Each structure stands twice: as structure tokens, then as C-alpha cells.
């Protein structure tokens, strides 16, 4: 079973498979149209086979983008058929999205990882933690801090600190353990952002993906937009855009990041009631001035 980063990728892949199967079947009658011509052997499939994809589902795709995101699998044809399959991102089929860097920056990894960090010259690691439902979660990661440098992010769950299980700890106890820890080596076991998920969308010809937000929270979804097709929900807060943290930024700044993004936009969202609980008692000015808003490297 194939997985896709967006509904647009799924739909376009189905069109590709149907066209390829039709063209490769010698039993099909010949139709004098460019769209159903035999598959060329030079790998240049899309300008002739799929001209309709350029405006499919409201997408704005040019031939170069389509060709760049499609890989023709080499090797002997099976039963006389040529095999044409889109490129994959993390085992996902993505004929429209392609190898988009925003998806890789925003990826929420399943499983648990271990990070090792040290305190800075002021004896700090640039991290604030919050206790939620007997678990400890990252509330704030400061820019250019040790916590930022090892890749910790807002919403990460801290399972262990220096081998001690954090389950049942209060926020104060977690901060106390970090404060008392030896400064040259602190080992933390992390579960990657369990309350968050990513949604990949595609801009239409006007440069929009189709949602409205206020104070960083999604309030409306535009009918028949990419946001609607891909299941974006209201009452969710935007945590990241293409992997870049936007928590604490003004709506105008978030809008600028969206508008300057490419045609593929991946946002990371969290249910509003959980988001509000995590940031509770943290001043907006702190989130704006201290939160790490840099673009992560991949």
C-alpha cells in the first residue's frame, strides 16, 4: 500500500498509473491523440502523456516541475510493460510534492532518540519544560542554545534525564534536575512531538493553500482548497511552517513566511487546547524574543 504526503500526490499518482497502464496495454485501441501516445523511451513522459496535470485539482504545475518529481525505474520491463513511478520521500510516493525540503525539515519521526548536550558558559541549556498528564514536554527552546543545537523542538516529550524516568515529575522537579546536572554532559531521551502532526498542501494559481488563522490558530478552512482536501482542521495552532518554528510570531510574520514559501507548504499543527496548556503562564514576549525561530538544517 502506497503512502502519499498529500491528497494531490495520491490523485496525480492514480492518473499516472492509469495512463501508464492504458498506454502499455497493446490490447487498447489506438487513439489519435497526443495524450495517449506510446510511452517514449527517453524518460520524457509528462509533456506528452499528461498535459492535463498542469492544472490538475487547481494546482499550478509546469512541465519542469513534473519532470523533476518523476523517476523512471530502470531495468527490464515486466511482461512488456514500462514501469514509471514517481520519486519517493521517506518511502512516500510524491509525484507533485517531489523531494521537498520543507517536508524533510518538518518530519515528525516515530520512535525515541537520545541527545547529549552540555551547559553554556552561563550554566544554562536554553530549555523550559512543562508537566502535562504525568509527562514532561518542551515548552521553549531558545535560539542558539545547547538545546537548539541538538535539535530539541517545542512539543518534544522528555522521557529521561541522565537515566532517570521523568514520568510523574512536576515542571519544577524537571528544572531542578537539569539545574543540578553536571554541566559537561546531560543525556536526554526524547519522543518526537507526540501531540503534533504535519499537513502538506499545495498552493493554487493565486498562491494560497486555503486556510485563515488568527493569533496563530486556524479559524477557517476555504472550501475546495488544498487545506480542505488534505484534512486541515480548525482549532489547531500552527507550530511550524516547513519545519521553521513560528510560535510567538505575529500573524503578519506568519503570513509572510507562508507567502514566500514555495508551491509546497508543510505546516505542523497541534490541537489548541493542548497548545494553550503547554504555553500557559509563558508571556508572549518571551516566546517572541527567546523561542528558536531559525530554519533547521536537513
Swiss-Prot record:
Phosphoserine carried by residues: 6
Outcome after substituting residue 215 to D: Disruption of the cooperative binding of C-terminal peptides from FZD7 and phosphatidylinositol-4,5-bisphosphate
Motif mapping: LYPX(n)L motif 3: 49-53
Tissues expressing this chain: Expressed in lung cancers, including adenocarcinoma, squamous cell carcinoma and small-cell carcinoma (at protein level). Widely expressed. Expressed in fetal kidney, liver, lung and brain. In adult highest expression in heart and placenta.
Record InterPro entries: APP-Binding, PDZ, PDZ_sf
Effect of mutating residue 214 to A: Disruption of the cooperative binding of C-terminal peptides from FZD7 and phosphatidylinositol-4,5-bisphosphate
Positions of post-translational N-acetylserine modification: 2
GO terms (BP aspect): actin cytoskeleton organization; chemical synaptic transmission; intracellular signal transduction; negative regulation of receptor internalization; negative regulation of transcription by RNA polymerase II; positive regulation of cell growth; positive regulation of cell migration; positive regulation of cell population proliferation
Descriptive protein name: Syntenin-1
Native organism taxonomy: Eukaryota, Metazoa, Chordata, Craniata, Vertebrata
Gene: SDCBP
